[in-house]
């Protein structure tokens, strides 16, 4: 084991060991449940109780958790520490933890599981020691929150490397997506292998769960799919693992998830075999594994097993298909439920599997599955092999069942692909044709359609010997003898003889079949009669191979020719049988029978010739019932058929022509006698119907007769109805057996033709004593459950003959099928489909409805009630079980009838009468009783009835509108009250909606009936329908209103308006219950139906009342919802309609009283009669009425108000219409008049409310509403509408004030250079501005003057910005006049602050336009403004507004008149900086403007001038603004100006440096930080200014500063020396940092003062701070000295001594600054002479020889030496011998601190410089 591995093991074992409190707390804070801070404080007792609680709950879910109560969750584990346990105990612990995690894995999303795992995390640190198992068990829950928690509790040091791909999600505390899981599985084989092994282990220990299986399946399937393009890697790497998993899954015996595990295995196997081309032995191995799965063929798994077997064998490419393991398949289970058949039908390919199964097993039952082989899907090798296996099976004389299975298989192949089968048969080693195959199978293939070209049968009449035979063993006829005389009838031995014949012929070639048949007949039969009838029957029997049938036909023809030639026999009796052969499906058979008919002619027959087969055929027929024709007529009949070749040729080519030949030619022949045809028909029909022919003959007879019956009248069918049809019910089993023996299709060959004989194009017979009830027979047939085939055929026949039935028979059939549909019996046909196929006429419909109507008399119409109450007696009566059953059946039948009626009403019901409606209402009453009294489920029936009523009413309307007739509706036919009652009582919205649609349709058809119930309808719609959130309800509601309201209006009812108001009130009342997304559409369509003029204002008023109520209750969300709806609703209408509605709204608003009304007053009665007012408004008190009126105005005004970002919809429409050149004058007039009408009404209301104090809120809202109404108009129209009001304001005219403000706002917001035209300019300058100026001059009222001034300012500003009109002299004169007024008592000199503020605002706007043209007014403006500013200090009420206005005016003056304000800058600065009520950012901006626009030299001078006053301020913000302005001024100042103003600036700087001193002596209360910030600004100003000066200018100024600092020269205050030095060095140090070496020489002015200062500094106050600054100053000078300034001896001597003399007195707090200073000095003056002096100077302070030496001096001197040696290095090594004795002495100093300083500091540095220990030198 490597060292790294050993270290890793040690780390893992000690990962949960915490050696200090901090790490222990961090380790303990990892929790799945608690926050880290909470978890860190929890003890193990509490955590154990949490875990036990979780485990207890888990035990109730799964008892397997019980075993952990005594292990992991035992009480003793509270004190368990895994870090001190033995390896064996730890291993057992890990095993228990793994077992628990496996078991708890499915329950991770549950709280108990998290609690239990929490204990394991906190006590056993499974997040550290079992982190891999923890992640593995939790991985299927990667999308849940628990997975993120699990990742979070695992420390990075313990994170399993195999899960490093999760680190990113762990750090972000996010769940990984499924794509990341898949990517990890795909890119990391080891991870996939690990999880595969883990899940197989889970399966083996029975802890796997569904989610885990789904997780593994999902990712594995996607993994396989991703490698579909890299099969090689998939086979090498992943496939072995997956196959191993499949194998273990298949063998799993998990009791709970056995089925799911096997399904998972099947799924994986399915994907594998679909994607990967496996070797054949793998397919075989997989199959063997599947068949060994326990329970693979159990019912719940059998389907999946067969599917996977099919998929596995679908890819098998081997040649071997015989495997023993297929014998283990339980065939009984496989054949049960037709499973394979259904799977094949679903598209699964079982070809290879079927071949393997049939090849591997000897059980004949497997042959029954051969029919499922799909030859069209199979490859050639598989198909050929399969066909060969079947042929071999057929050749070994299989039993009947096996042969039938083989035949069924070939027939299925023929149906699937005939050409493919023929191709594969031809490709065999011994090629075969279909005819050969039929001979092998000893039967005819029903789908073979063998062509004549495939038949090689000798056609010669001469007897030929066989040319050869096949290798098959011939069949012997020894002992075979038949005594049957005729085979025309059903006989027992025919089937055996026919099979013997086919077997007898099998060894021979087909061209000798006829001769061999002759031999067979000669050997078996005793006479020609038997031979002829046998060959005849064989010729028409489908089960016999076609080759044999043709050969029999040849033999028959030979026999008939022989008899005809003999002349002793008349053959005409057999003619009807031979004619049947002309209806065979094969043309070759039909041709043979045609030739046989030609052979019947016996022209030389003797008169005494016998009639062939007469005795055999008619032996059981009484002589009186025999219907024969004479031999002569027989000859004539034969001659008729054979004389004209075309007759028989037609039937040979087309068998259907036989019907026409018989019924149109033969049966209507009039030669040799007129009744010859009738005689022939009688003969044929009698023989066909009387004689019990075999099924093969009867089938053809039925087909011929039914073919005639379907196409034309066929009275002769009656003979068959009495016989065969009547006996079908009793003899169907015999028919079925005969059909099966002959391979006839029982349905198509027997039943259908026979049933088609019932009924026809003539009326069906009615029951009487002599005739059969054909309708009754059909009814019985439809109910004949013993034979479903007869049922289905009868139902089809019913639909065919229905139109020829009598009305009463139609009703009988309707009733029968309704009964069948209503029954619970399983039917073999769709009764409803049959009912719909039988067209329903009006009379039948009416009869059916009456049959199912319970109440004979509809109850009388009464006053509508809320709901009909069910009586207890009725309920008790209906509670009987028998009655309930009867009622249920009745209801079911009634529903079927109504469904049928609905179908026919939609399709083809033409005639309709009011009686039908009457029946509907009777049924409606029935359903009410059944629903309420019987508690029956009548909802669907009611819905269908409502639909029928709706369709019927629509039909009647269509008839009336088409003019084809007029159907009148009266109260006997229509009962609106019943509809209303049903609507009210029903709980189904669908029924309610449909009945509302019925009401809608009846409204125009019978308005006088419906309108009596209109109020309850409206009430119901408002209370219920309007709340439904579906399209149908919405449509029903709108359609009802759309049709009822016009009818209501057309009726001319006086209460129309009240009813409309009632409707709208009910709708708006339910507003909150209407689905939000349907509100606008509903009410807009409602308004369009009612008419905009009749409804919009009412809806607005009712909405406003709701808004006021909601607002008063504080439901602002509902208020907002109501406003949103109303805005969307109003957008649906034209602008003129909206304005008209607003006007009408205001009219309604005026009707709302302001105080309660007297109930006896007319006004009260009038309002109370109107639904929109009513008691809800009239019952309010004074305060509530005022609130209502105010709320209504607020509501309507909210619809008009806009914001800065958008324009109101109505305003947009109004502007669009008025400004559009295409709009007509009439349209514009309507809009303008609409606004004026509303404005006039509001002005009138203002006159009423303006003087009433309690109506102030109402009047305020009215003013705002009036403003918003006028705002709708474009600017030009608006100005024209308000000019008159502005001209003559009366007193405090709120209207004029609002109009002026509104005008200003509209000008500000709407006027732009692009839309300013001459018309607007004229209105503004020629109309508005003069009126405003005149109003200001009149000085009537402060508020009016203020509004006029503001409007003037806005108008002038906009005009000045958008036009150049003020360049004209006449317009300038207007502004001059305005300025004159504004600077008079009406403006600046006014005593009213509001007028002063507005006047300054207006002056600013005018100056902005006029510029220097306003210079004449400058004195009139500036001085009063300054005086106004001064007054603000005494009048604090309006201080902020006035000061702001003053500053803004100053800013405008500075911008437009910069040259003229220079003399006033002092005042401007004082006012600006001193306006404390104005925000500092505003003042700063104005100061910046002054600096920008005015010459900076004047600005600097003014700033210096005002400093004296500014410095006295106790507001730091004021001084900060001043200094900010100073900095900006200096930045803008040119160098030339800076030099010229330098002396002034230095004087200002000296004053600024003295600021700290003056503050300390004054009452100014500044904290130290504030003073530091201000001084920093002083220094910043000084530095900025110095940077603009040259040396020539700055040097004398600097000398002056030095003199000020040293002597106080130029001081304006009695500042002490220390303060001056401190202020000076603060500034000078910053200058040094900026100018560096440039200013080093300036120290010549400071050497003597500094030297002197250092010598006496210890005696000064605040010496420490000053010392630090001096040291820093000297350090900077030494550091930046590049010209050996300090190396000059005099300078060195001046500073060296005073500097070293600071060592004894240096304070510890600033000692480091002295060290830096001295070391920098040494570095700077480095020369032998200077160094020698410095060394001895420093030795002085470490040598014990001097009395001044002490531990303090030694310590700081040592530190200086240390720093010097660090910087000088080798340069000072020459002085080491001088210093060594003193160092040695210091190392033995009595003061340990000194010794330590030397040993750890100086000695270390010296050794570093020397590169060797210092001990050698010390010794």
From Swiss-Prot:
Keyword rRNA processing (UniProt): yes
Cellular compartment(s): Nucleus, Nucleolus
One function term, GO molecular function aspect: U3 snoRNA binding
A Gene Ontology term for the protein's cellular component: small-subunit processome
Keywords: Nucleus, Ribonucleoprotein, Ribosome biogenesis, rRNA processing
One of the GO biological process terms: positive regulation of transcription by RNA polymerase I
Keyword Nucleus in annotation: yes
SMART domains: BP28CT
InterPro entries to which the protein is assigned, alphabetical: ARM-like, ARM-type_fold, BP28_C_dom, HEAT_type_2, HEAT_Utp10/HEAT1, U3snoRNP10_N, UTP10
PROSITE patterns reported in the protein's UniProt record: HEAT_REPEAT
HEAT repeat ranges, renumbered to this chain: 1779-1817
Main localization of the protein described in the UniProt heading: nucleus
Superkingdom classification of source: Eukaryota
One Pfam family it belongs to: HEAT_HEATR1
Matches recorded under PANTHER family: BAP28, HEAT REPEAT-CONTAINING PROTEIN 1
Function, as annotated: Involved in nucleolar processing of pre-18S ribosomal RNA. Involved in ribosome biosynthesis.
Oligomeric form and interacting partners: Component of the ribosomal small subunit (SSU) processome.
Family: Belongs to the HEATR1/UTP10 family.
Protein name: U3 small nucleolar RNA-associated protein 10
Species this protein is from: Meyerozyma guilliermondii (strain ATCC 6260 / CBS 566 / DSM 6381 / JCM 1539 / NBRC 10279 / NRRL Y-324)
Species lineage: Eukaryota, Fungi, Dikarya, Ascomycota, Saccharomycotina
